[in-house]
Amino acid sequence: MRFFFYGTLLDHDVAAVVLGRRLPPNAYVPASLPGHARRRAKGASYPVVIPDPRGEVPGVIVGGLSARDVEHLTVYEGPGYRIVPLRVRSHGKLETVTVFEPVVSRLQPSQDPWDLALWQRRHKRAFVQRLRRAFSGRPVYSRQ
């Protein structure tokens, strides 16, 4: 299965903890989600995407995900997101892939744009520590 990642899963360490394994660098194919904007979720450090006819959200397509991977991703994303097919642009072509789209009744966007590099500087360390604890009931990826 192929997914478009646009938020914290763009960080390879986060993806490794969630999936229980590190994906090879070539698993991440640059792509963008036209007709949307990426905002920080209200009261949170992670993003949501919202419709915006002038917007285009950068991200990656990750393919070759197993049913178990999708299960882990679904647990990670939680009830605030639903899995939907959306059209993304990659290498100049539009293609349909799977995206975790926010459920508006559960996650509200702030006015603040979300930036991966800023999130990594400000929030990543504590976020990954919490994530490792949350996923400690099953084997997680370790660099050791």
Regions inferred by a protein language model and the residue ranges of each:
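Glycine-aromatic micro-motifs
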Residues: 1-144
